[in-house]
């Protein structure tokens, strides 16, 4: 029997948050260690950078398809299918040997992850009562940030203790658990409204382009700091914790720049900016000699941009009170 949605934390809402947490943890426990694994496979720095750019390109490239997929097909099935697709892409690291295979896997994984995260955001909103969707959106966004935090700071360091194959298996178990949780969620049927195949709705919030750039710069600096070795490694971990803690207030800021029915788009835009910056920072950190200096400078620039550009822009352009 379907549970009442008059309260926010319904069983289905808890389930979609748990599934989102598991999805992010599964992805982000592997992403930080893939550059090192690529080096072991014989890839050079340029090939690794291109591979991760393809991951980001995959996330961005499928963006115009989000609205169509969410309208033409059942969103729960879209989430299940593309979560499974991400899992299959990461399982491919157990057999991949050639550079072109790495690039293909990364591009497909990025595209699938982008669609899965957007489908999850949409479901999280759909199963929440309209007057609670603002709070629900922030809680859902934080569940992903918490998964990212656990993946980067708690699970990826296992690379120092376990062989890569075992880490992939752990990641696949998390993917499987996420799939199992999603199957138990009730999502009410919504009749298609006839959205075109290519549409930036549910992908990028145009009014949020300034804070999106700001978040991307901040995440880039944090990605650089995450590459630090002991005794400075704690700085990178601390900054990832800070980034996760900022997710809820940043989600609120992005949502206040959105019009009616654009909460999900605001969340998707924030997630895209955050993950793009982090991924680029993790990869470029392999090439930069002084990550501590450049990371701190980048974060300071991001803070300065927020105070002098983003916040005044937000006060001028905000749509919601």
Give names to the regions the model predicted.
Residues 167-183, 295-312:
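Symmetry-related core transmembrane helices of the 12-TM Major Facilitator Superfamily/SLC fold
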Residues 262-289:
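A late C-terminal transmembrane helix in Major Facilitator Superfamily
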Residues 7-51, 56, 209-210, 222-229:
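Helix-loop boundary and gating motifs at the non-cytosolic
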Residues 139-184:
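Helix-loop-helix hairpin linking two adjacent transmembrane segments in secondary transporters
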Residues 230-250:
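C-terminal transmembrane helical hairpin of 12-TM major facilitator-type secondary transporters
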Residues 61-94:
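Conserved MFS/SLC helix-loop-helix module at the cytosolic interface between two early adjacent transmembrane helices
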Residues 107-143:
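Cytoplasmic helix-loop-helix junction between adjacent transmembrane helices
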Residues 56-64, 148-149, 278-279:
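Residue-level signature of mid-helix packing/kink "hotspots" within the transmembrane helices
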């Amino acid at each position: 029997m379907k549970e009442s949605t008059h309260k926010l934390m319904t069983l289905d809402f808890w389930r979609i948050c748990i599934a989102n947490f598991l999805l992010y943890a599964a992805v982000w426990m592997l992403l930080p260690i893939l550059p090192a694994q690529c080096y072991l496979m014989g890839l050079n720095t340029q090939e690794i950078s291109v591979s991760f750019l393809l991951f980001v390109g995959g996330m961005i490239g499928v963006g115009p398809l989000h609205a169509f997929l969410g309208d033409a097909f059942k969103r729960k099935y879209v989430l299940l299918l593309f979560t499974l697709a991400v899992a299959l892409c990461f399982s491919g690291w157990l057999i991949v040997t050639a550079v072109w295979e790495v690039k293909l896997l990364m591009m497909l994984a990025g595209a699938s992850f982008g669609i899965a995260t957007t489908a999850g955001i949409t479901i999280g909103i759909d199963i929440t009562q309209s007057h609670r969707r603002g709070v629900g959106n922030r809680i859902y966004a934080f569940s992903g940030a918490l998964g990212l935090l656990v993946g980067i700071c708690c699970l990826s360091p296992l690379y120092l203790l376990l062989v890569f194959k075992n880490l992939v298996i752990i990641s696949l178990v998390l993917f499987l658990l996420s799939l199992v949780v999603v199957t138990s969620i009730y999502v009410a049927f919504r009749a298609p409204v006839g959205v075109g195949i290519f549409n930036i709705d549910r992908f990028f919030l145009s009014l949020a382009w300034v804070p999106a750039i700001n978040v991307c710069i901040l995440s880039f600096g944090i990605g650089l700091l995450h590459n630090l070795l002991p005794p400075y490694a704690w700085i990178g971990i601390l900054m990832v914790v800070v980034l996760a803690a900022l997710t809820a207030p940043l989600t609120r800021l992005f949502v206040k720049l959105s019009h009616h029915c654009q909460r999900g788009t605001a969340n998707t835009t924030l997630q895209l900016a955050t993950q793009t910056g982090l991924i680029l920072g993790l990869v470029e950190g392999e090439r930069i000699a002084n990550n501590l200096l450049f990371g701190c400078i980048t974060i300071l620039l991001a803070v300065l941009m927020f105070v002098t550009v983003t916040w005044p822009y937000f006060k001028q352009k905000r749509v919601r009170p």
